[in-house]
């Protein structure tokens, strides 16, 4: 793969990256993902260390982001869309960290839409998650009730994507206001763009 393969960049990228490491997160450890979970690109070793110094515990999960994450929905009725599958692995340490957060009445903050899907797929009641691996085909859209995630960091996404549907599920009608502000202020969208912090989802 390092010799013959190419980085599967999103379709809105043209040409090649000058530095492929720019499309790699500080959390990456194994080969398998077809795309970077781009919300993680906002985190540097300095940012991670700063969070730790403030008492923020970081728990990692293994994600295999699929290429379909970039593809727009081709149906007008969102209920008719068949979402792609993505493989994941939740270590025991991550499941234990979620449980410890619940005991101290803390918040579970997901970094990226794939992490949100993963945690919600592995939900087992009372805001907890099961350790282990599997495939997620969970389609989080308006009306979905979050069972694990209390807040999230995510990029600004393209229209007609399942990523926008997920943001709308978390923010309700406020997502349009948030995106209008982003456009007005010139925030950058997509993989190397800016991020938003969803603090209080409407259904948590």
What are these regions (language model features)?
Residues 1-204:
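Surface-exposed, charge/polar-rich loops and edge strands
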